[in-house]
Amino acid sequence: MLKIGSHVSMSGKKMLLAASEEAVSYGANTFMIYTGAPQNTRRKKIEELNIEAGLAHMKEHGIEEIVVHAPYIINIGNTKNPDTFALGVEFLRSEIERTEAIGAKQIVLHPGAHVGAGPEAGIRKIIEGLNEVLTREQTVQIALETMAGKGSECGRSFEELAQIIDGVTHNEKLSVCFDTCHTHDAGYNIVDDFDGVLEEFDRIIGLDRLKVLHINDSKNPRGSRKDRHENIGFGHIGFAALNYIVHHPQLADIPKILETPYVGEDKNNKKPPYKHEIAMLRAQVFDEELLTKIMNDE
């Protein structure tokens, strides 16, 4: 069965219940959340996340598997500022606790950026950070995300991710989140040869580690190292390639999460595309009028 959903918001008093309600309104059967704002460390107590009501709503609507995304202020690749590294380690630990409390098994993490010290130094620091964070007892896996390679990001190649995984003691607690926009922007030819890319992933990392897919089109050509998401079928990856990935038999059990941009010129009146994009991917037919339909919410 196709597991498809999107990033949804966990906010207000309803928290996890609000996230599940939003996902159901899009016709989703999985979803991804940040446990608070992705750009800061302010978090509600676990007791205030409304977990029981959220889980009941999920069960009622057949949602069994959800994903958490770690905030992007965490940078355990930072070799230059010990405070940034220490904050990243401490905050990642608390996010894992929250992920466990919510009942999710995967927390997606941007591996980190070396901020000028070079990829080797950044990777060593990321390994150090993950070794401080991971415990044998935890039930959650950290899903290292494939990165586009913009700026000083580490994890732009399968080899870099494998290097991180190989260096970590409890690496059974590590998995991978494959982002279509990022891998395309990093230079992988997922448009014409996705099976070849998947074989390469299997050879270097192992398909058994692939636990989350981020399904995004890209505003930029392959190899641009930009990381700018586009709506499904309206970018340089295109509908056919993304549809092929979403329905790929080897990836059937993996949750596919859309992180495509809201639609509309007026920043105060942007519309979420997810209901329409999910329906289009289920139907496996590209709709050229999709963006208009999203704005009119037809």
Swiss-Prot record:
Sites where the protein binds Zn(2+) 2: 145, 179, 214, 259
Cofactor: Zn(2+)
Any one GO BP annotation for this protein: base-excision repair
EC number(s) from the headed UniProt entry: 3.1.21.2
MF GO annotations: deoxyribonuclease IV (phage-T4-induced) activity; DNA binding; DNA-(apurinic or apyrimidinic site) endonuclease activity; phosphoric diester hydrolase activity; zinc ion binding
TM region positions: none
Record-linked SMART domains: AP2Ec
Domain of life: Bacteria
UniProt entry keywords in alphabetical sequence: DNA damage, DNA repair, Endonuclease, Hydrolase, Metal-binding, Nuclease, Zinc
Enzyme class name: hydrolase
Positions with a binding annotation for Zn(2+) 3: 182, 227, 229
Positions bound to Zn(2+) 1: 69, 110, 145
Cofactor: how and how many bound: Binds 3 Zn(2+) ions.
Gene3D superfamilies in UniProt: Divalent-metal-dependent TIM barrel enzymes
Reactions accelerated catalytically: Endonucleolytic cleavage to 5'-phosphooligonucleotide end-products
Pfam family, one: AP_endonuc_2
Primary role: Endonuclease IV plays a role in DNA repair. It cleaves phosphodiester bonds at apurinic or apyrimidinic (AP) sites, generating a 3'-hydroxyl group and a 5'-terminal sugar phosphate.
Family to which this protein belongs: Belongs to the AP endonuclease 2 family.
Protein name: Probable endonuclease 4
Gene name of the record: nfo
